[in-house]
A protein has these predicted regions:
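Residues lining the SAM
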Residues: 131-133, 157
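Class I SAM-dependent methyltransferase SAM/SAH-binding core
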Residues: 66, 72-118
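A short, conserved alpha-helix within the catalytic core of class I
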Residues: 136-149
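A short acidic, Gly/Pro-enriched loop at the edge of an enzyme's catalytic core
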Residues: 121-128
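Short alpha-helix
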Residues: 184-200, 204-206
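Conserved class I S-adenosyl-L-methionine
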Residues: 1-59, 155-177
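Conserved Class I S-adenosyl-L-methionine
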Residues: 204-266
Length: 266
């Protein structure tokens, strides 16, 4: 297979949105996304990605980090415990507002709103170029740009497996499969790894597996389900039966893939 075929594998079938449409989509999701991630019952700093950074000594106090699609700044906050020279970029200004508040005590923190491909063109500007779950990286040219602006490492994180038993119960009730979540697009990692390899680098891959208790609301579930009005009413009634004090308790079975590569062969 040639490298362009891996690019097609990496890309989803979703239609391409205009930049201004993407901004509105993520602005509208920002409050829900912030509340959902902040209330997760997990010690985020214990995630494998941060253990890799520490064990491999990828960063020091003088390192410069760029987080592409930084969202509300969860990863930046952890990186700031090692270095204060952190930059977050996102298409959503509202997401960045949450990140700015979270990182308000980090004097060197910078936040750049807009299209990262337009805003970051300087060669070897950062020690680590990082991206987690972002749709902003889907082409060979995006990966090439990451390598260009990094002087040392590039690192990406992506869900490759996700299960929620409550969603499975909804599927059983409806007698059909629900729409595939973005988090279950494991072919993305397959395409990404092969593109990086074909570009001449030597990517390492790690798997972060965990089960976490999760507390969700009816809105959390409904925002991620595509259904008819009739099905919507059935799902709402079903979820009401699961609710206790407005909360629905479940478990998430998660596997995240982490790909790390050094832009310097030696």
């Amino acid at each position: 297979m040639n490298i362009e075929e891996f690019e097609k594998i990496m890309q989803r079938d979703d239609k391409e949105e205009k930049e201004e449409d993407l901004e509105k989509i993520w602005d509208d999701k920002s409050e829900w996304f912030f509340k959902r991630t902040e209330k997760k019952q997990e010690n985020f700093s214990d995630r494998l990605i941060f253990k890799i950074v520490k064990e491999k000594k990828l960063l020091n106090e003088n390192s410069k980090v760029l987080d592409i699609g930084c969202g509300t700044g969860r990863h930046l906050l952890e990186f700031s415990k090692i270095t204060s020279h952190i930059t977050g970029t996102d298409i959503s200004s509202r997401m960045l507002d949450y990140a700015k508040e979270k990182l308000k005590n980090v004097n060197e923190a910078k936040f750049i709103h807009g299209n990262w491909m337009k805003n970051f063109t300087k060669e070897k500007e950062f020690d680590l170029v990082f991206a987690s779950m972002t749709p902003a990286i889907s082409k060979i040219e995006h990966i090439n740009r990451m390598c260009l602006i990094s002087k040392n490492y590039c690192m990406m994180e992506r869900f490759v497996y996700y299960r929620d038993p409550v969603r499975e119960e909804i599927e059983k009730m409806l007698g059909r499969k629900l729409n595939k979540l973005h988090s279950n697009h494991k072919d993305y990692i397959y395409g990404l790894w092969n593109i990086v390899w074909n570009l001449g680098y030597f990517p390492e891959i790690y798997l972060d597996k965990y089960i976490s208790e999760t507390e969700k609301t009816m809105i959390d579930y409904m925002k991620q389900i595509i259904c008819t009005d009739e099905e919507k009413n059935k799902i709402i009634e079903f979820l009401k039966g699961k609710e206790k004090n407005g909360k629905i308790m479940s478990k998430e079975y998660v596997i995240k893939a982490i790909i790390l590569w050094d832009v310097n062969i030696f």
